[in-house]
C-alpha cells in the first residue's frame, strides 16, 4: 500500500470514529499518527479540535501553536488558535492570531469576527466596530456581526446607530432584531 493510500485510510478511520461519536478513540489515533508524522497538518488540526471538544482547550492551544509553527501559511490554523486563545482569556494572543489569519486571507470573515470579539473583550470598541464592519461586508446576511455591531454601538453610547442596525436586521433576521430590542430597550420596544 502506498503512503498516500495509508494516509487516506487512516483519515477515513478517524472520520468514521467521529461519525459514531467516538472522539476519544479518534484522538488516540490522531496522537499515534503524530508520533510517526509530527508535522501532519490534518492530524494537528483535527487533534486540536478534538482536544477542545473534549474540554481541554490548553492542549488544543499547544497543538495549534505547533500547527502554525510548522505551517505558518495556514490561515485556518491561525484562526483556530485565535479562537482557542480567546476561550482561555488570552486576549493579546487571540488578537495576534486573528490578525495573522487576516494577513494571510483578508476574506476570512470568521477571523474578522473573532478579532472583533477579542477587541470588545479588551474594551477597544472603536477598533471592534471597524472589524465588525469588515465582517458584515464579507458576510452581509449573517446576523452575528450585525448583532455585535449593535451591542458595540450601545456601549459607545450611540443608540441611534444601534437602532439602524436593528432595523436592518428586521429585514432578514427578525428574531435577532427582537432579541436586541429586548436586551437594549431600543427599536420597537422603545417606540
Where are these regions (language model features)?
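Alpha-helical segment of the N-proximal tetratricopeptide repeat
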Residues: 6-55
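Helix-start (N-cap) detector for alpha-helical repeat units in TPR-like alpha-solenoids
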Residues: 7, 41-42, 75-76, 109-110, ...
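Structural signature of tandem alpha-helical TPR/SEL1-like repeats
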Residues: 19-32, 54-66, 87-100, 122-134, ...
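Structural marker of alpha-solenoid helical repeat scaffolds
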Residues: 36, 70, 104, 138, ...
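TPR/TPR-like alpha-solenoid helical repeat scaffolds
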Residues: 117, 147-157, 176-191
Amino acid at each position: 500500500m502506498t503512503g498516500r493510500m495509508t494516509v487516506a485510510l487512516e483519515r477515513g478511520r478517524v472520520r468514521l470514529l467521529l461519525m459514531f461519536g467516538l472522539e476519544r478513540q479518534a484522538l488516540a489515533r490522531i496522537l499515534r499518527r503524530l508520533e510517526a508524522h509530527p508535522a501532519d497538518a490534518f492530524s494537528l488540526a483535527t487533534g486540536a479540535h478534538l482536544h477542545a471538544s473534549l474540554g481541554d482547550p490548553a492542549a488544543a492551544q499547544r497543538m495549534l501553536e505547533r500547527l502554525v509553527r510548522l505551517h505558518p501559511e495556514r490561515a485556518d490554523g491561525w484562526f483556530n488558535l485565535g479562537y482557542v486563545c480567546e476561550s482561555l482569556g488570552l486576549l493579546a494572543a487571540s488578537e495576534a492570531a486573528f490578525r495573522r489569519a487576516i494577513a494571510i486571507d483578508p476574506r476570512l470573515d470568521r477571523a474578522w469576527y473573532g478579532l472583533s470579539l477579542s477587541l470588545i473583550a479588551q474594551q477597544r470598541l472603536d477598533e471592534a466596530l471597524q472589524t465588525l464592519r469588515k465582517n458584515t461586508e464579507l458576510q452581509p446576511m449573517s446576523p452575528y456581526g450585525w448583532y455585535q455591531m449593535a451591542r458595540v454601538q450601545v456601549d459607545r453610547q450611540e443608540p441611534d446607530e444601534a437602532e439602524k442596525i436593528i432595523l436592518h436586521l428586521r429585514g432578514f433576521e427578525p428574531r435577532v432584531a427582537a432579541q436586541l430590542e429586548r436586551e437594549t430597550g431600543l427599536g420597537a420596544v422603545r417606540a
